Amino acid sequence: MVVAVYPGTFDPLTRGHEDLVRRASSIFDTLVVGVADSRAKKPFFSLEERLKIANEVLGHYPNVKVMGFKGLLKDFVRTNNARVIVRGLRAVSDFEYEFQMAGMNRYLLPDVETMFMTPSDQYQFISGTIVREIAQLGGDVSKFVFPSVEKWLTEKVAAMGGPAA
């Protein structure tokens, strides 16, 4: 049984993320979506909110588990007995960072492979950062996120005082 981990902050989870989950879950016996508690990135949504969002969007996949984690990815991978780390590459600009991370992960976890996947064409330009910015400025994000995620974004922006002018 091959277990893979797809780590990320998923802040918020986009249609691009779901596209990779759908495709990766058809390759591996179990796909663990690891929602990182990355304080360095100063997330828009709390870890608890991101876990709820991910479960709402991904809960219908029978072989996908959504779990939060803190600390090193290597420890999360080991805890889940994963043999593969799945990473998404949207553009060439993502490659340099992801290549360095894959090298470090190989050093820390020599028996674990990193698999890069590119999103489907219609999702290659989507990033959580861009989606958050559009939402905070009052723009339409419905083509980039699922309706439940759009609702979370709308409520969060409203709680912060509404869209910036």
UniProtKB/Swiss-Prot annotation:
<dbReference type="InterPro" id="IPR014729">
    <property type="entry name" value="Rossmann-like_a/b/a_fold"/>
</dbReference>
<feature type="binding site">
    <location>
        <begin position="88"/>
        <end position="90"/>
    </location>
    <ligand>
        <name>ATP</name>
    </ligand>
</feature>
<feature type="binding site">
    <location>
        <position position="41"/>
    </location>
    <ligand>
        <name>substrate</name>
    </ligand>
</feature>
<keyword id="KW-0548">Nucleotidyltransferase</keyword>
<feature type="binding site">
    <location>
        <position position="87"/>
    </location>
    <ligand>
        <name>substrate</name>
    </ligand>
</feature>
<comment type="function">
    <text>Reversibly transfers an adenylyl group from ATP to 4'-phosphopantetheine, yielding dephospho-CoA (dPCoA) and pyrophosphate.</text>
</comment>
<keyword id="KW-0963">Cytoplasm</keyword>
<feature type="site" description="Transition state stabilizer">
    <location>
        <position position="17"/>
    </location>
</feature>
<dbReference type="Pfam" id="PF01467">
    <property type="entry name" value="CTP_transf_like"/>
</dbReference>
<dbReference type="InterPro" id="IPR001980">
    <property type="entry name" value="PPAT"/>
</dbReference>
<keyword id="KW-0067">ATP-binding</keyword>
<feature type="binding site">
    <location>
        <position position="17"/>
    </location>
    <ligand>
        <name>ATP</name>
    </ligand>
</feature>
<comment type="similarity">
    <text>Belongs to the bacterial CoaD family.</text>
</comment>
<feature type="binding site">
    <location>
        <begin position="9"/>
        <end position="10"/>
    </location>
    <ligand>
        <name>ATP</name>
    </ligand>
</feature>
<feature type="binding site">
    <location>
        <position position="73"/>
    </location>
    <ligand>
        <name>substrate</name>
    </ligand>
</feature>
<comment type="pathway">
    <text>Cofactor biosynthesis; coenzyme A biosynthesis; CoA from (R)-pantothenate: step 4/5.</text>
</comment>
<feature type="binding site">
    <location>
        <position position="9"/>
    </location>
    <ligand>
        <name>substrate</name>
    </ligand>
</feature>
<keyword id="KW-0547">Nucleotide-binding</keyword>
<dbReference type="GO" id="GO:0005524">
    <property type="term" value="F:ATP binding"/>
</dbReference>
<feature type="binding site">
    <location>
        <position position="98"/>
    </location>
    <ligand>
        <name>ATP</name>
    </ligand>
</feature>
<keyword id="KW-0173">Coenzyme A biosynthesis</keyword>
<dbReference type="InterPro" id="IPR004821">
    <property type="entry name" value="Cyt_trans-like"/>
</dbReference>
<comment type="subunit">
    <text>Homohexamer.</text>
</comment>
<keyword id="KW-0460">Magnesium</keyword>
<keyword id="KW-0808">Transferase</keyword>
<feature type="binding site">
    <location>
        <begin position="123"/>
        <end position="129"/>
    </location>
    <ligand>
        <name>ATP</name>
    </ligand>
</feature>
<protein>
    <recommendedName>
        <fullName>Phosphopantetheine adenylyltransferase</fullName>
        <ecNumber>2.7.7.3</ecNumber>
    </recommendedName>
</protein>
<dbReference type="GO" id="GO:0004595">
    <property type="term" value="F:pantetheine-phosphate adenylyltransferase activity"/>
</dbReference>
<dbReference type="GO" id="GO:0015937">
    <property type="term" value="P:coenzyme A biosynthetic process"/>
</dbReference>
<dbReference type="GO" id="GO:0005737">
    <property type="term" value="C:cytoplasm"/>
</dbReference>
